[in-house]
Amino acid sequence: MAPQLLLCLILTFLWSLPEAESNVFLKSNVANRFLQRTKRANSIFEEIRPGNIERECVEEKCSKEEAREVFQDNEKTEAFWTVYVDGDQCLSNPCHYRGTCKDGIGSYTCTCLPGYEGKNCEHVVVKSCRLFNGNCWHFCKTVQNDTQCSCAEGYRLGVDGFSCIAEGDFSCGRIIKSRNKREASLPDFHFSDDYDAIDENNLVETVQSQSATLLKKSDNPSPDIRIVSGLDCKLGECPWQAVLIDEHGKAFGGGTILSPYFVLTAAHCLNQTKSIAVVVGQVDISRKETRHLLHVDKAYMHSKYVRATYDHDIAILRLRTPIQFSENVVPACLPTADFADEVLMKQDFGIVSGFGRLHERGSTSDILKVIRVPYVDRYTCMLSSNYRITPSMFCAGYGNQPQDACQGDSGGPHITAYGDTHFITGIISWGEGCGRKGKYGIYTKVSNFIPWIKTIMRRNQPSTESSTGRL
């Protein structure tokens, strides 16, 4: 009896299965009345429907143009797209010290707060003089992760710790507008019988070319070379300009006023005449009746000067009587070596002045000329010359314009302005012709000789120095 009952139960279960399936699963025509989905591809109304980022880019893969149609904004599209393509790189917050992260495709960019740098803003920036000269008006020095400003002689540091305040009426490097147009009559000129080339404990000596090591590539550079196509320098606009006068009363070179007793010039100028006098404060040297000649007491030539190649072409003249400063006579400031190399010589232009030839084969000028000359990078400088450009030299000029220093300008100033202060950066030395295409003027690099200049001036300072001077 039991087997028969079990068989009946099995048959009953099998008979009920189709009915159970029909109760659970609806037929397709019935199901479609409840479940409907609009087809995406090739829909007739697809292009006229308003953009929807979920429909466009979530339900299916979209292009950047489709995303742009949704946002109608390039910036929002870029922000979405960088995350959509490969995820948000900024989710891990990779930027340190509260830096702001911006996602990119396969990368990210951190915008750091002031004082931090690096890909992830991970480096604390030490205050550096290389950044805007530490905001210093003159000289900058890094001290224990901070910057310390200082000023040229004749200036004091302002209370803000950055500015430099002139202490006198004629502090160095200042161009002062003259109110007095009258020039007083000055004594007749008189020449010193001679001047001495002093050996200052091996700091200076007269160098014979035959004993020097020649550094040239071929023949010697043009002697006494070094304004062509310059503008007239008005009275008071080049107040540091000195003119060298020979024993015949003729101008033959230039110099830069450093203090009441000292004038900077080129070493090769010392070989041009038996005696030297200096004139300052003039822009027209044809007016000999207004000249006041300052007699050279001693001349200090750099001990490493090479006459054949103009290497170390620098000298200092000490005057018997001091220069009287005025609106038209002001010394140039002497920079520190670091300030000259890292700040001044990275400016676009320097200023060159002189009474030299107006063109290569022309006559010298009675009127002081001035030009702006751009600094030339060292590689271009070396390629342009047939002669070796030593570390004590630099190039300035246009290369493709006839504006240059020329014969008779030798020893004159190359000045660079920083703010309202003018610093001596070079000495007109030599060149291959004047204003030739592809050629530049060669200048003695003053920053290489700052310790030498200061030593000469300190050791040979007259005890009767005028109080108007600035060393």
Curated annotation (Swiss-Prot):
Disulfide bond sites: C57-C62, C90-C101, C95-C110, C112-C121, C129-C140, C136-C149, C151-C164, C172-C333, C233-C238, C381-C395, C406-C434
Cell compartments where the protein resides: Secreted
Top-level taxon of the source organism: Eukaryota
Keyword flag Secreted: yes
Domain EGF-like positions: 86-122, 129-164
Residue span, Gla domain: 41-86
Domain Peptidase S1: 227-458
EC number annotated for this UniProt entry: 3.4.21.6
UniProt modification remark: The vitamin K-dependent, enzymatic carboxylation of some glutamate residues allows the modified protein to bind calcium.
Sugar-modified residues: S92, N271
Location of 4-carboxyglutamate modifications: E46, E47, E54, E56, E59, E60, E65, E66, E69, E75
Positions of the pro-segment in this chain: 21-40, 182-226
Gene Ontology CC terms: extracellular region; extracellular space
PROSITE patterns tied to this protein: ASX_HYDROXYL (PS00010), EGF_1 (PS00022), EGF_2 (PS01186), EGF_3 (PS50026), EGF_CA (PS01187), GLA_1 (PS00011), GLA_2 (PS50998), TRYPSIN_DOM (PS50240)
Reactions listed under catalytic activity: Selective cleavage of Arg-|-Thr and then Arg-|-Ile bonds in prothrombin to form thrombin
Gene Ontology BP annotations: blood coagulation; induction of blood coagulation in another organism; proteolysis; venom-mediated blood coagulation
Pfam families in UniProt: EGF, FXa_inhibition, Gla, Trypsin
Tissue: Expressed by the venom gland.
Keyword line: Blood coagulation cascade activating toxin, Calcium, Cleavage on pair of basic residues, Disulfide bond, EGF-like domain, Gamma-carboxyglutamic acid, Glycoprotein, Hemostasis impairing toxin, Hydrolase, Protease, Prothrombin activator, Repeat, Secreted, Serine protease, Signal, Toxin
Family: Belongs to the peptidase S1 family. Snake venom subfamily.
Subunit field text: Heterodimer of a light chain and a heavy chain; disulfide-linked.
Leftover remarks: Is classified in the group D of snake venom prothrombin activators, since it requires the mammalian factor Va for maximal activity for the cleavage of prothrombin.
Protein name as catalogued: Venom prothrombin activator vestarin-D2
Biological classification of the source: Eukaryota, Metazoa, Chordata, Craniata, Vertebrata
